[in-house]
Design a protein with these regions (language model features):
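Positively charged n-region of N-terminal signal peptides that target proteins for export
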Residues: 1-4
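Short linear motifs in intrinsically disordered/low-complexity regions
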Residues: 6, 19, 100-101
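Short amphipathic alpha-helical "recognition" segments used for binding
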Residues: 6-7, 93
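Bacterial N-terminal signal peptides
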Residues: 7-17
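Bacterial Sec-dependent signal peptides at the C-terminal "C-region" and cleavage site
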Residues: 16-28
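Accessory carbohydrate-recognition regions in carbohydrate-active enzymes
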Residues: 25-252
Length: 252
């Protein structure tokens, strides 16, 4: 019996010796690295494989962000088989059948007159897409712009990297139904979106502030016929390489 205990102890010691602990320079793989936010996104009205969208968000975050491939108001905001980006949307959507509320979007573009969701749309490829809960990156081929997004508890940080040539801009679309967008100064946009799918008070508003690290050279405040889609097109001078925006949001 004593020999058995000794043999068992020796076996345990050998097993422990074979285990390697991460060195000081090594990083442990975070659980979030195992998450693919693209699972379930190959869905549409006729067939669901999950009816999800690639949420860029922290656990229990106030707001989620997602790439928008569908048209404004489409419950399937992101479909894996789509090849065009229309914007990067703040969303609170629980499912495509219930749809969204309090949403607005930002879209970096090149050139002027890009407010309409069709004219500002850009081709993108999943080959250039990185989709993690804490970080999203893609490349807008038609505009030659790289987009990066990372979330906070209540907001998000975005970085748009533009080409060296041609005038660049950022479209802020607060969607329809009485939403408003205005300018505080040459770095700050404030507004609110009233867009919803029902079930909210009559005076519902989702207020937002967008603060940029670089002043814009001009602003075009847009209000389509009938007050359909208020928003703004911020223009940056030629040679502006990178713009970072920070957003803050409050619901009333």
């Amino acid at each position: 019996m004593k020999k058995g205990y000794i043999a068992f102890a020796a076996l345990c010691a050998a097993a422990l010796a074979s285990c390697t602990c991460p060195s000081a320079g090594e990083q442990r793989l975070r659980p979030s690295e195992y998450v693919s936010t693209l699972v379930g996104t190959q869905s549409d009205f006729s067939l669901s494989t999950g009816n999800t969208y690639p949420a860029i968000a922290l656990p229990w975050g106030m707001n989620f962000w997602t790439l928008q491939t569908g048209k404004m108001g489409d419950g399937w905001a992101y479909t894996y088989g789509a090849h065009q980006v229309r914007g990067f949307k703040q969303t609170h959507q629980p499912s495509p059948w219930i749809n969204d509320y309090g949403q607005f979007s930002l879209m970096p573009v090149r050139g002027e007159d890009k407010f309409d969701e069709e004219s500002r749309a850009s081709w993108f490829s999943h080959q250039s897409e990185v989709a993690k809960p804490y970080y999203y990156k893609t490349y807008l081929a038609d505009h030659d712009i790289r987009v990066e997004i990372t979330p906070t508890d209540r907001a998000a940080m975005m970085r748009f990297t533009f080409p060296d040539s041609k005038e660049s801009g950022v479209v802020i679309d607060a969607f329809d139904r009485g939403s408003q967008v205005g300018m505080v100064d040459d770095r700050t946009i404030v507004g609110y979106t009233t867009r919803n799918s029902g079930g909210v008070p009559e005076n519902f508003r989702n207020w937002f502030v967008v603060r940029f690290d670089t002043p814009f050279s001009a602003i075009e405040l847009t209000d389509a016929p009938g007050g359909y889609k208020p928003g703004s097109n911020l223009l940056y001078p030629e040679g502006q390489k990178s713009v970072t925006g920070e957003h803050a949001v409050a619901k009333v």
